[in-house]
Amino acid sequence: MSGPLVVAVPSKGRLQENAEAFFGRAGLTLSKTGGARDYRGTISGLDNVEIAYLSASEIASQLARGSVHLGVTGEDLVRESIPDADKRVLLIDTLGFGGANVVVAVPQAWIDVRTMADLDDVTTGFRARHNHRMRVATKYINLTRSFFAAHGIVDYRIVESAGATEGAPAVGTAELIVDITSTGSTLAANGLKVLDDGVILRSQANLVASRDADWSDGPRESARIILDHIHARARASKYREVRTRFKGCDAAMLTEAHNRFGVVAPFGGPTSSGMLTLHCPPAQIYALGSFLRAHGAETVSVASLDYVLDRENPLFARLEAFLRS
């Protein structure tokens, strides 16, 4: 008998709250079996699923080992801690929270340094004058090396940072930094600026799958159910349901509505009584309502959608293709 599908989610703070809210919106209620301090949990209604509450960095390492099947973690941690990440894990879907950029930041006083090419010149000159390489404080060692190599920068050395990286230039432990930032305000408060082409990675929380986990039939079916929930909720969030009834609707009018407003008719054209159901992007609701009334509709109703379940699930299809490759 195969073991459970193990899903790792952040164990504390805003990331945990956002992850639980994300699953909750998809109809997947997470709960800790032993109370708030427990690090194991369940999803209501799914007996073959175990939730593991871990730090975001631990989630990335456990995905690399294949100790968990799915995990919620930042792309920055995946790219930094997992060599050849695209071969070992699959970023199934972005989750819309935890957004931040990994950036190269230099002192604002370096007024002539705006690009990575400028930085290359500065690092070369610095080594010639001081007989040692310029120091870069960061916890993103692998991302820094790859990005600097792509820009041909070699005259630097990394100073590994455990925390408060943005303060390193001010206290004299480094000349510049590579760090993660959401708004840039902390960098600015420490007298730093992001280079114009210095964004290494635009990161956010992702749902990630491990290739090396045990993907036997039980865990695979549980993953299909979870991804079905997630896709159904994501599809529903893109539309509102519009319903009306009138005799003047035909294929040409539906084609025009699709082209002008991006609507789809999930159940085909109108019924014999003239009933018509459309899915419409929220921003186009009023325009579509005006269009339908101009063509003869007396009443147009609009409702929110909780879930839209399609025959095919592109999220699970991506996972299946990844595991087969």
Curated annotation (Swiss-Prot):
Function summary: Catalyzes the condensation of ATP and 5-phosphoribose 1-diphosphate to form N'-(5'-phosphoribosyl)-ATP (PR-ATP). Has a crucial role in the pathway because the rate of histidine biosynthesis seems to be controlled primarily by regulation of HisG enzymatic activity.
Family listed: Belongs to the ATP phosphoribosyltransferase family. Long subfamily.
Catalytic reaction annotation: 1-(5-phospho-beta-D-ribosyl)-ATP + diphosphate = 5-phospho-alpha-D-ribose 1-diphosphate + ATP
Names of the cofactor(s): Mg(2+)
Cellular component terms (Gene Ontology): cytoplasm
Pathway: Amino-acid biosynthesis; L-histidine biosynthesis; L-histidine from 5-phospho-alpha-D-ribose 1-diphosphate: step 1/9
Molecular function per GO: ATP binding; ATP phosphoribosyltransferase activity; magnesium ion binding
Name of this chain's protein: ATP phosphoribosyltransferase
Activity regulation (record text): Feedback inhibited by histidine.
PANTHER family named among the record's database cross-references: ATP PHOSPHORIBOSYLTRANSFERASE, ATP PHOSPHORIBOSYLTRANSFERASE ATP-PRTASE
EC number: 2.4.2.17
Organism: Bradyrhizobium sp. (strain BTAi1 / ATCC BAA-1182)
SUPFAM superfamilies noted in UniProt: Periplasmic binding protein-like II (SSF53850)
A Pfam family assignment: HisG
